[in-house]
């Protein structure tokens, strides 16, 4: 596990080189939560209702905006307003995976207008380094307008059974993150990757990549489609800074109560990890 994982969110925020990661750690500390809720619902009303009800207990809301049947300006403006009201970030789980020219248009153009409202996006590096370079280039362009309020997570590992996001793929994810560290704030992975070394790159004292771990569920070990779950304690024990929970929260009989339970367990696991630091 990365030595930075042993530090408090406050300590990491105070020295973090990435402005959005700094803000995220500050939100987590202020609200005492490391929960990201994956709001995989299919209407704007459901999404905004969940965001409003769960907002006080989460650090991030994760969307799959293209599964909404009625995406519109109301969706964008509603999400932005609730993010401000409840002090959380928005993570669009678009998983960009195409040539650079295409992903630039998908991110900063098109009907979904992702760059306008999503603080965090993610990508797979299967197309190669160019996808990370292209997204970073877009975010640093003079006419971008959102600057340090946007960041990228590289999908370095997945929790689904038989995932091919392993080995050299994961190592290259870390290499690209180090090269484009001004825009890449961290990874979606099952563990801390800060100690990964290769012929291309090695850890530096100042780097502090944020780790989001998916597939966190208190009451289930998996589903029929290959998803493999772990608990908040096991995820954070392996190096997760933020836990991503979907059905365990939004499909619960009482989503608010479920979010509070994940908040409690996630925060206790974080406190246990940092000890007296």
UniProtKB/Swiss-Prot annotation:
<dbReference type="InterPro" id="IPR001754">
    <property type="entry name" value="OMPdeCOase_dom"/>
</dbReference>
<comment type="similarity">
    <text>Belongs to the OMP decarboxylase family.</text>
</comment>
<dbReference type="InterPro" id="IPR014732">
    <property type="entry name" value="OMPdecase"/>
</dbReference>
<dbReference type="GO" id="GO:0005829">
    <property type="term" value="C:cytosol"/>
</dbReference>
<keyword id="KW-0210">Decarboxylase</keyword>
<keyword id="KW-0665">Pyrimidine biosynthesis</keyword>
<feature type="binding site">
    <location>
        <position position="40"/>
    </location>
    <ligand>
        <name>substrate</name>
    </ligand>
</feature>
<dbReference type="Pfam" id="PF00215">
    <property type="entry name" value="OMPdecase"/>
</dbReference>
<comment type="pathway">
    <text>Pyrimidine metabolism; UMP biosynthesis via de novo pathway; UMP from orotate: step 2/2.</text>
</comment>
<dbReference type="GO" id="GO:0044205">
    <property type="term" value="P:'de novo' UMP biosynthetic process"/>
</dbReference>
<keyword id="KW-0456">Lyase</keyword>
<feature type="binding site">
    <location>
        <position position="247"/>
    </location>
    <ligand>
        <name>substrate</name>
    </ligand>
</feature>
<feature type="binding site">
    <location>
        <begin position="62"/>
        <end position="64"/>
    </location>
    <ligand>
        <name>substrate</name>
    </ligand>
</feature>
<protein>
    <recommendedName>
        <fullName>Orotidine 5'-phosphate decarboxylase</fullName>
        <ecNumber>4.1.1.23</ecNumber>
    </recommendedName>
</protein>
<feature type="active site" description="Proton donor">
    <location>
        <position position="95"/>
    </location>
</feature>
<feature type="binding site">
    <location>
        <begin position="93"/>
        <end position="102"/>
    </location>
    <ligand>
        <name>substrate</name>
    </ligand>
</feature>
<dbReference type="InterPro" id="IPR018089">
    <property type="entry name" value="OMPdecase_AS"/>
</dbReference>
<dbReference type="InterPro" id="IPR013785">
    <property type="entry name" value="Aldolase_TIM"/>
</dbReference>
<dbReference type="GO" id="GO:0006207">
    <property type="term" value="P:'de novo' pyrimidine nucleobase biosynthetic process"/>
</dbReference>
<feature type="binding site">
    <location>
        <position position="229"/>
    </location>
    <ligand>
        <name>substrate</name>
    </ligand>
</feature>
<dbReference type="GO" id="GO:0004590">
    <property type="term" value="F:orotidine-5'-phosphate decarboxylase activity"/>
</dbReference>
<dbReference type="InterPro" id="IPR011060">
    <property type="entry name" value="RibuloseP-bd_barrel"/>
</dbReference>
């Amino acid at each position: 596990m990365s030595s930075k994982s042993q530090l408090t969110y406050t300590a990491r925020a105070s020295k973090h080189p990435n402005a959005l990661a700094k803000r995220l750690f500050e939100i987590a500390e202020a609200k005492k939560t490391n929960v990201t809720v994956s709001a995989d619902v299919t209407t704007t009303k459901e999404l905004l209702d969940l965001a409003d009800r769960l907002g006080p207990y989460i650090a991030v809301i994760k969307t799959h905006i293209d599964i909404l049947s009625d995406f519109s300006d109301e969706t964008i403006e509603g999400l932005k307003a609730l993010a401000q009201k409840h002090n959380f970030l928005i993570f669009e789980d678009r998983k960009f995976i195409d040539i650079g020219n295409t992903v630039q248009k998908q991110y900063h153009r098109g009907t979904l207008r992702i760059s306008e409202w999503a603080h965090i996006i993610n990508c797979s590096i299967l197309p190669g380094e160019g996808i990370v370079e292209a997204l970073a280039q877009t975010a640093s362009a003079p006419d971008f307008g959102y600057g340090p309020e946007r960041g990228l997570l590289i999908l370095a590992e997945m929790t689904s059974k038989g995932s091919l996001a392993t080995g050299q793929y994961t190592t290259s994810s870390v290499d690209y993150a180090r090269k484009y560290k001004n825009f890449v704030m961290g990874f979606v992975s099952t563990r801390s990757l800060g100690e990964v070394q290769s012929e291309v790159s090695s850890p530096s004292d100042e780097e502090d990549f944020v780790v989001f771990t998916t597939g966190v569920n208190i009451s289930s070990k998996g589903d029929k489609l290959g998803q493999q779950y772990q608990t908040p304690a096991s995820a954070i024990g392996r190096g997760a800074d933020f836990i991503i929970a979907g059905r365990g929260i939004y499909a619960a009989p009482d989503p608010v109560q479920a979010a509070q339970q994940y908040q409690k367990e996630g925060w206790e696991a974080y406190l246990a990890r940092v000890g007296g630091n």
